Amino acid sequence: NLPYAFCEQIGKEIRDISDELPFEIPDSWEWVRLGSICEIARGGSPRPIKQFLTDDPNGINWIKIGDSDKGGKYINETKEKIIPEGMSKSRFVHRGDFLLTNSMSFGRPYILNVDGCIHDGWLVLSGYQTAYDKDFLYYLLASSFAYYQFCEVVSGAVVKNLNSDKVACALFPLPPINEQHRIVAKIEELLPYI
C-alpha cells in the first residue's frame, strides 16, 4: 500500500498509475479514463456514398465534418441526408452525444443538436451524462490538456488518425457535478474577455 497512490484495476491486476497523472487535483475530484465514463465508437460510411444520399427532407441526417464550424460548440444541422438503408453501414448518433474529429484536424469536440449518422471521420462519445456535465466535458475536450494527450496517441505518417481505444485510455479529471457547474459558469463569464 503506497501512501497517496492512484491505482486502477485492469482485469484482476491492480497497478499504481501515479506516474501517469499530469498534475494534482483536489481531494473531492478523481482521475478517470475517458472510456470508463462513456462509450466511444467510430463512425462508418456506406459506400459508394452517392448511392445512399437523398434529397428527401425526411431522410436521415448525414453528419459530416463540413457541418461543423471550426471553434464552434454545436452541430445544429446537416447539408446532406441519407436513405434508411445507409444506417446499417454507418453509425447512428443522438442529440446530446459528443462528436470528436478523428482524422486530419483531429480532436475537435462538438455537441450534437441533431440525430443522424456519422462517417468514419468521427468518433462518438455517448453515455457520459452520469459523470460529466455536457458543457464541462466540452471545455475539457476542447482544452490543450486534451489535445496534447491526443497528440501523443495519434497514428499515421501523413494523415493523422485518432483510434477509439487510445482515446478511451486518456486520463481526465472528474470533479463533482456541482463543481463542474461552477467551473462552466466561470469559463462562460470570462470567455467574452479572451
Say what each PLM segment does.
Residues 1-6, 187-194:
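Short amphipathic coiled-coil heptad-repeat segments
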Residues 8, 14-20, 35-52, 66-95, ...:
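Sequence-specific dsDNA recognition surfaces
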Residues 40-44, 108, 150-152, 156, ...:
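Conserved helix-loop functional segments at active or binding sites
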Residues 31, 70-72, 107-109, 192-193:
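Flexible loop/turn segments at secondary-structure boundaries
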Residues 64-66, 77-144, 153-154, 163:
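A short beta-sheet element
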Residues 15-45, 173, 177-184, 192-194:
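Non-catalytic DNA-recognition/assembly elements of restriction-modification systems
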